[in-house]
Regions:
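Conserved phosphate-binding/catalytic region of the ribokinase-like
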Residues: 81-167
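Ribokinase/PfkB-type carbohydrate-kinase core domain
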Residues: 1-113
Length: 167
C-alpha cells in the first residue's frame, strides 16, 4: 500500500479530512498530519480497526475531532481500548455509530441523539451504503448543520444508495 506516500501538506485548501480504512502506516501518518496542520478530521477505522493496538487507537481518538463506525466496530473499539462509548465520545466533538436497520446514534456534548433509519424503497445494492452515509456526515459537518440534521442527511444518502445499483 502506498497511501503513506501521500501527504496532507501536498494538498491545497483542506478544511476537513477523513482517515478511513487504508494501509496502517498511511492511516497513522494522515492522522498525525491532519492534527499537526490543525485540520479537523473524522477517524473512520472500519475494517482496519483490528490492525491497531490499544495505544494506537487511543492516539487516533486523541488526535481526531470526530469518529464514525458501525456498531460492530464500536464494540470492538470498546473492547480494545477498555473505554466505554461515552468515554470515547467525551474526547471528541462527536462519535457517530451506525446501527444498520436500527438507524444511527450520535454522541456529542454529553448527549445521545438517535437518528432514525430512512427506509429505502427497495434494497438493490448495499455496496457503498456506509460510504454514502459518511458523505452526508462530512457534508453536514462542513456546512455547520446541527447533529440531528447531519445524521438525517447521512441516513437519507445511505437509503438512496441502497435503493440504487452503483459503482
Amino acid at each position: 500500500n502506498f497511501s503513506a506516500n501521500n501527504h496532507v501538506a501536498d494538498a491545497a485548501n483542506i478544511s476537513l479530512g477523513i482517515v478511513a480504512p487504508d494501509g496502517r502506516d498511511g492511516m497513522i501518518q494522515h492522522s498525525e498530519e491532519f492534527a499537526e496542520a490543525g485540520i479537523p478530521f473524522v477517524f473512520d477505522p472500519g475494517q482496519g480497526l483490528p490492525m491497531f493496538n490499544r495505544d494506537e487507537l487511543l492516539r487516533f481518538i486523541d488526535l481526531a475531532d470526530y469518529a464514525a463506525m458501525n456498531d460492530y466496530e464500536a464494540k470492538m473499539l470498546e473492547e480494545k481500548t477498555g473505554k466505554t462509548l461515552s468515554d470515547i465520545a467525551g474526547s471528541l466533538k462527536a462519535l457517530v455509530v451506525t446501527r444498520g436497520g436500527d438507524g444511527s446514534a450520535i454522541y456529542t456534548g454529553g448527549k445521545h441523539i438517535d437518528i432514525p433509519l430512512v427506509t429505502a424503497d427497495e434494497i438493490v445494492d448495499p455496496t457503498g451504503c456506509g460510504d454514502s452515509y459518511r458523505s452526508g456526515l462530512l457534508y453536514g459537518i462542513q456546512s455547520g448543520f446541527d447533529w440531528e440534521t447531519t445524521g438525517r442527511l447521512a441516513s437519507l444518502l445511505g437509503a438512496i444508495k441502497i435503493a440504487n445499483k452503483g459503482p
